[in-house]
């Protein structure tokens, strides 16, 4: 790549180093300013930050203005980084059970010895049972996932299970409907109307631009429709709120398609030139009237028509689709139907609509996941395919269902998993069915926890391997659009451990694949990823604030490019074989799924199980959006815990009165499957027939004397209350239902 395409973070290398405090300056230096990237949200790439360090100790983080996405903004989580880094719950040494007996006391061992022990076991099990006896659970899209996938491919196991609670569940159906490699994003800068559908930009990645974009768009007059059971922080930005019942997004989207097609509000030229299966879809959605959807969603038919018409008739309108749609057995069809709404109304790849990313002069990094090793035979050994085999591998490579892996441990079908590694994930806190998950962790032959902090799952583990925080990593590489950065280690390791990357690279070498793992040299692994850019890590480090390529001039309507996108499918065919929007989806049909989006009832609901609803009259669901926490962690951080010290059940004032509950009361929430005991928060920002809770409370906070919570009955874990089974899962992406019916009563 020509150097003229690069834009340094700020001036010359020496100049930026002095600004960063990395070069000597005259006089004593009390505080060293070190460019880094904040990963307190757990994102694959995070916000640019400056670590403030004195005498080797982190004092805090401040925003890095040179970072193109957060532009100097940081959230409460970033400001709590020192408390998290120095938490008494940090894991600082590898731990193994005394005498190898599960439940026996923990014994500290050297980190390298822990890797030796694990490698020895995996090699023995590969010889005796096959490589597929290893399964790894991990969140999707983490910085180490490429290394984790590389190890599985090198070892010969297809069994990667991502958490099934975010991103993939909507992204895969979009890919097979619209092409591209990820969903097109809402154009906040030019939209006149925004549908926030299951999305919370006020707390989800807010510093990375969502909240800023929403605020700026509202100032220039953009109208906002919020579509979800609660308004949350988006209420102050919204002009209208469609408060649908949890898990009914597919019904709403299908009825909006009914209006758009039935009233001929679609873009005729686009449909003629770029859509396949319009006649079949038009006939199919005739059954999904707004009156029908009203009975399921609880949204009046007139309002459904009004919003559908407004969206279709506004030239610059976009849909910002979020995690909220991903927790129902109809998740994939909800995503497909929303993708079709974007396309049919002429809002795809047009100003103010939904856009694919611009082009950059900075080439993408090289993939290191060894996807070339994926074969039909390897795919056939998936213990519990995340998607039908006809739709795999997808962008993330081969994947098993997170919950399916745990279930297979219990059933031993189609074969038993012998060793399970939980890498940066908490299956008890994050996955559905805490009781069955506990049974699986108790049964599996060998269970390994890899994390920076103590977890609830450690109680069932045989081996615990600590890893470094982002502040302690010697080797790190960040890519965000055209921006590349090699963050500098802010503080030395606080214990005996390496980074997540070190863990997978060193384990790969110990398993006998040193050539595939750069002979243990992590620096070389980053150099390989950087090859397309013409840079090396040594060169990148000369620019502590990173380097940026140019954003090329935006062009629109790039349909041929994205409709022809080819993923890692074994036959190398494009996601859209006809090069057009798949309204009638032949790939889904070939995989045994419905070629057209359809409605699937939630397993337990007002219309799905009316008899059950007579005994359990309220709908329970949960949400992940929080300005202080991230999923199931950070409750042990004092400054964050002060902001939300207890788990709270959101309940409407009228519903609370009918239950004899006042704001702040302790309440029992009971479903047919389990119970919670939490505090009530009375709010008008929720449907009357629905109660909602923030997912993820289990940690205590020693410094504040605040308790932890059980993940089972009587605790604060909504996953303990949901139904399980095939009827609660999406057939295309195995999204799990997070809806059930409950009673709420005041605890005296």
PLM feature spans:
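Flexible, glycine/charged-enriched surface loops at secondary-structure junctions
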Residues: 129-133, 266-271, 318, 349-356, ...
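Flexible glycine/proline-enriched surface loops and loop-helix/loop-strand junctions
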Residues: 100, 197-198, 237-238, 288-292, ...
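N-terminal leader/propeptide and maturation segments of large enzyme subunits in energy/redox metabolism
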Residues: 97-113, 263-301, 384, 491-582, ...
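Active-site phosphate/pyrophosphate-binding segments
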Residues: 256, 276-402
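Glycine/threonine-rich phosphate-binding loop and adjacent beta-strand/alpha-helix elements that clamp
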Residues: 185, 471-493, 504-513
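Extended redox/cofactor-interaction regions of prokaryotic respiratory oxidoreductases
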Residues: 146-215, 220-227, 234, 250-254, ...
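N-terminal export/assembly segments and adjacent metallocofactor-ligating motifs
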Residues: 1-263, 300, 395, 507, ...
